[in-house]
């Protein structure tokens, strides 16, 4: 469950290491984002020479959350950290690699490129 001011780890190789959520997209009064939801964020920590630098405003899709999520079959999925992948305007990932597992909900929300790059889909 990601809300404004939440900090997330970046799970790709764009050069950003940590982002801070500015806004959850999908309605004027939407408060929380889960796996597969798009957020607007700012880069809080980045490595030198990366594609993005500190202070950049970016769009990202949430791929892992600590808050458990109930699936239609009754099972629950949760992760050890909150993580996101930076995306372009056309919802393709900005990086060329994805680190760590991602939730199956990304496939339902049509983020197929991220699913194909991920080493594991849970």
Curated annotation (Swiss-Prot):
Domain of life the protein comes from: Bacteria
GO biological process terms on file: translation
InterPro entries according to UniProt: Ribosomal_uL14, Ribosomal_uL14_bac-type, Ribosomal_uL14_CS, Ribosomal_uL14_sf
Molecular function in Gene Ontology: large ribosomal subunit rRNA binding; structural constituent of ribosome
Record's keyword terms, sorted: Ribonucleoprotein, Ribosomal protein, RNA-binding, rRNA-binding
GO CC annotations on file: cytosolic large ribosomal subunit
Family matches, as PROSITE patterns: RIBOSOMAL_L14 (PS00049)
Pfam family, one: Ribosomal_L14
Residue ranges of coiled coil: none
Family, as annotated: Belongs to the universal ribosomal protein uL14 family.
Subunit structure: Part of the 50S ribosomal subunit. Forms a cluster with proteins L3 and L19. In the 70S ribosome, L14 and L19 interact and together make contacts with the 16S rRNA in bridges B5 and B8.
Record's function text: Binds to 23S rRNA. Forms part of two intersubunit bridges in the 70S ribosome.
Stated name of the protein: Large ribosomal subunit protein uL14
Lineage start: Bacteria, Bacillati, Actinomycetota, Actinomycetes, Mycobacteriales
């Amino acid at each position: 469950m990601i809300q404004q001011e939440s900090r997330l780890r970046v799970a790709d190789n764009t050069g950003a290491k940590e982002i801070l959520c500015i806004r959850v997209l999908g309605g004027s009064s939407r408060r929380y984002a889960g796996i597969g939801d798009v957020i607007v964020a700012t880069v809080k920590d980045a490595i030198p020479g990366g594609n993005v630098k500190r202070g950049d405003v970016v769009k990202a899709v949430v791929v892992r959350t600590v808050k458990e999520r109930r699936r239609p079959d009754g099972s629950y999925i949760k992760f050890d950290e909150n993580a996101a992948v930076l995306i372009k305007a056309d919802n393709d990932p900005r990086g060329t690699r994805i680190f760590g597992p991602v939730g199956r909900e990304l496939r339902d929300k049509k983020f197929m490129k991220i699913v194909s790059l991920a080493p594991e889909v849970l």
